[in-house]
Amino acid sequence: NLKAIRTFAFFGCSSLSSIRIPDRLELLSYSAFGGCSSLTTFDIPPQVSRIEEWAFASCESLSSMVIPDSVTNLEKGVFCACTSLSSVSIGNGVSSIEPGTFGVCSALTTLRIGSGVKTISKDVFLECSSLQSITYNGTKEQWQQIALAPEWNEDIPAKVVHCSDGDVELD
């Protein structure tokens, strides 16, 4: 009957390399897995609707992440300093990507953004110097409706966003 992984539940468990979470889980709380530096994979259950601040911060061995459609918001610093994270797919349910979500994810090269995103905040990709490929699940017109913070993309080398009906050049 586990519905939530609470604040600091596994924080700093540096030997934790994998964990199986029940499908009924709905919430990953503040820093729930922060500092689990050996955690290599984590499957977010399909019922999770909220991932709180810093939930996976400094999980230095995570290499990829798929965020299910059930998640509605990526709060501040969720994946900050996940230095091995190279690929992320954000589900269509996420509407907001908050500051520092992927900050200092220096290995991040590929990002897929769901069509439900309405806001991308400043410093989401702070020091993401390897991010070359951004794909958006919606159209070019939908992309242009997203509220993009000034300089949201200042630290990334990607020059275009690949949309379902063509590319949008980034400023």
Predicted feature residues:
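A structural signal for leucine-rich repeat
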Residues: L126, I146-E151
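Structural signature of tandem-repeat unit edges
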Residues: N1-A4, C13-L27, S37-R50, E60-N73, ...
